[in-house]
Amino acid sequence: MVATSVVQQSSAQRDQRLVLWLDELRLEDVPLVGGKNASLGEMIQQLTPQGVRVPSGFATTSYAYRYFIERTGLDAQLREVLGGFDISDVTELRRRGRKARSLILNATFPDDLKAAILDAYHHMCETAGQNLCFDDESCLADHAYTEVDVAVRSSATAEDLPDASFAGQQETYLNVYGDQAVLIACKKCYASLFTDRAISYRTTKDFDHFEVALSVCIQRMVRSDLATSGVMFSIDTETGFQNAVLITAAYGLGENVVQGSVNPDEYVVFKPTLKSGHAPILSKRLGTKSLRMVYDTTGTELTKNEPVPLSDQARFAIAEDDILQLAHWACTIEDHYTQLRGSYSPMDIEWAKDGLTGELFIVQARPETVQSQKSQTELRSYILEVPDGAEPVAKGRAVGDLIGQGEACVILDISEIGQFRPGEVLVTARTDPDWEPIMKQAGAIVTDQGGRTCHAAIIARELGIPAIVGCDNATQVLTTGEPVTVTCAGGEEGLIYRGELPYRVETTQIDSLPETRTKIMMNVGNPEQAFTLAALPNDGVGLARLEFIIANHIQVHPLALLNFNQLPDGNEKRQIQKLTALYEHKPDYFIDKLAQGVGTLAAAFYPKPVVVRLADFKSNEYAHLLGGSTFEPHEENPMLGWRGASRYYDERYRDGFALECHALKRVRDDMGLTNVILMVPFCRTPDEGRWVLDEMAKHGLVRGENGLQVYVMCELPNNVILADEFSQVFDGFSIGSNDLTQLTLGLDRDSSLVAHLFDERSPGVKRMVKMAIQTAKENNRKIGICGQGPSDYPEFARFLVEQGIDSISLNPDTVVKTRLEIADMEQQMG
């Protein structure tokens, strides 16, 4: 039974009620309770039956806010305070904001509004089965057991609209308990409508201060102080890739993640195959998570931060089951809002895990406001021209894909923001909403702390400003006044260079590019760039290289992981131990990292084909991996030695190849990315091809099973001469024009002495290519090319098209140019 005054209110017109329960609300109630609270009600009503958990609670209405302003006589006073000043004057902005907030905090709640709030709060306590002490001092010491602890959050009526994020502008108060504390928190929320950043933001976005009202949500606390919490997006925040869920997680209450006080863990999940019952966790990145926010049970504050033990920092904050559950909920929420709005609606969601029950909850969900508003027809690429010898002075997590420049301004405390000048690069430990008046004037933003979902990252995306977060030491290595270049154009890692380096911007209208009969595919290797590259017009990936993933993400020789205890003690062994610290069984490190890298490449282009070439390091290159020198022979000419297929079935390496197979099987079977086609490199004979297929089958990669296709690189003269026989072993060919050219012409392409003779357009090479295409066609086998020749020489590309090649795979920077050229060629050919 709802408390008396709440029942009385329900008899009035709904839009004149002072308090509404969340389960009474729907999304159309934004004018009444703001976007945040309307969204909570929508999820409680519509998504609880689908398993999405949202804590219960109630909301004061926008009518209650306006009633408060009117009854207290604040309207005229606030209009006078906020009228006629320049918001770029930070000192004056702070003075006016402080005055406006003081007016609200010193006002008294009308009796009926106070009663409505407290009656609803008491009802929450009763339904929670707890005994109230109603501010009796004798029981204050036992408040954790006598009163419901609640989260008190503000929700502006203009908040969380798809094209205007008000994220973090109004306040949130956690672990609030007792009548007076709830009332004070509500009043503080009202006052937060006039924080400096909120005044500045509304003015910039041309929102009338007095057209915006505020609703307050009083919601049962989720005890994530005893567990974990974080933020997730149902879209990739940097690239706009729509098929990914990004999840961040840290220990304790969620404010540290939102504010950027910690560097959280990050997880990426692929939506399409998640929905079909697979477990496609594409990446897991460990954050430092050095602090956690918990209840302050002994001090005078509601919450406090405490250090996280190193053992907890060194492990992931949530298990894979929780990652997948959260990703499922993100999909459910996104699908619901997309259907509700009639257009694609990616979501920005806050979640928390209750340490008492072990249950996950959604505590907020609002529209994503940056990527969803970007043009889907134009692709803009920033290319930094780094001089030889230039090294980055700091690194962190890139936000967006832009480049910014200017003089650094290192500010360690909010009280110093008056020294910031427009156009400078803001360098600080972290930001919160109080920094927004100067953030929008920055040429770039750099922080020591924070992850991709922290306050600095969210605001930088919205403002279209390049930012790098989580640098750890930027405030120490950068100096106020020195020119710097901040680049987010290279993938997930952002780099800061001293000086203003040259760069260029390339714009492509991707909606106007012509279709071609010849498939135009891409050569890729770096998973960090995959989501960006997938936005280019393409027909899939003709060559996905494992070498980049192994050299940069794994760094360790597979046999060194299998035989770790046999390695000599020394620096390399210590490095391997550090890299694999999360793994009890060290070979699992190789499998995990390779599966995540390949999975990301395959997911980016799904469901288009992604041809993954098995590792093709030469022995000298394998030796450069950590621990590699112990297991690799010295060869005089490794280019023609123990490489490609000959390694996979060899007793000396087959255990290492088994790890590769396990990773690729995980990508196809566990992640559900069956668009992956495998390709065997440097396969000298058809028999060798069969031996490799047998070896793969031992580890669950059976050609033809679950749609698995296996191609072979056509890069040796023998591959061409015996193409009929190779066609009986493999499903397709990819011409490797680099090796085929050097082996047809009998030269070393790495030797400068004969480099002038290397030419794919040589008549002998072209005859080899023509024979390969013709034989593949006769045997009903797919054939493409993945070398550099078609990119460099339009006449060579024309030759390939004339021969009827199925696909041409290009480096990403030549995809658009070559597509236009091939479309023109095909049109001329008729």
Predicted features and spans:
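Acidic, glycine-rich flexible loop/linker segments
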Residues: D75, V370-S372, A394-A398, L402-V425, ...
